[in-house]
């Protein structure tokens, strides 16, 4: 699964794991990505989105219709 949120655009970050002796090794910090299905009344169908936890909260606040309208305007395939 791609580690990118379709709503916020959040992707992986990169940094170091630091051991007790302070040796640094490269690592990747992945966002909390979930697949979630919503019923979209304006489209009259279900839409499955790949979302971060922040993206889910954004949909809770703004509403699924507003978020899907923005995604369609950006050209995201749903």
From Swiss-Prot:
Chain spans, region Disordered: 1-30
Keywords annotated in UniProt: Ribonucleoprotein, Ribosomal protein
GO molecular function per UniProt: structural constituent of ribosome
Signal sequence residues: none
Keyword set includes Ligase: no
NCBIfam families named among the record's database cross-references: L28 (TIGR00009)
Protein name stated in the entry: Large ribosomal subunit protein bL28
The organism of origin for this protein: Micrococcus luteus (strain ATCC 4698 / DSM 20030 / JCM 1464 / CCM 169 / CCUG 5858 / IAM 1056 / NBRC 3333 / NCIMB 9278 / NCTC 2665 / VKM Ac-2230)
